[in-house]
């Protein structure tokens, strides 16, 4: 079980959660994801790792409330626990040796753009970001 340490409503349909997951945070890299289950009977939900903090041992996820499982996840508050939180999964995005990059994201897909842009910047790469949303109410 993993504790929710921060919850922020980014807009009426998108939520950010920071979750205690030290083993996941220790190994997380940009471009990877986690799979969670809200409770023992819940379905498995794959979500992008939007950020990670190795020192605090936390993983940040951003999700759009679109169906039963994300509605159930959104009911949880700071201090509540997520039943299963597995990761990091997937192949990290290649970031080594690049000099100038445009990182593009749209809507909730901007969640994956941030850790990639952050890592590239840390490596000394010139990073330009292009983000888009359907309308001003959906900006995260």
Regions flagged by a language model, labelled:
Residues 1-78:
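Ferredoxin-reductase
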Residues 68-140:
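FNR/FR-type flavoprotein reductase catalytic core
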């Amino acid at each position: 079980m993993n504790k929710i340490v921060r919850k922020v409503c980014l807009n009426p349909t998108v939520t950010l959660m920071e979750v205690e997951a030290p083993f996941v945070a220790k190994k997380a890299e940009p471009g990877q994801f986690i799979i969670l289950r809200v409770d023992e009977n819940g379905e498995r939900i794959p979500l992008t790792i939007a950020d990670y903090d190795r020192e605090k041992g936390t993983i940040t996820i951003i999700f759009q409330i679109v169906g039963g499982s994300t509605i159930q996840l959104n009911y949880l508050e700071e201090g509540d626990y997520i039943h299963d939180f597995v990761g990091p999964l997937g192949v990290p995005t290649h970031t080594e040796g690049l000099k100038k990059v445009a990182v593009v994201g749209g809507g909730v897909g901007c969640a994956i753009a941030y850790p990639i842009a952050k890592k590239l910047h840390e490596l000394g790469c010139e990073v330009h970001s292009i983000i888009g949303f359907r309308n001003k109410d959906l900006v995260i």
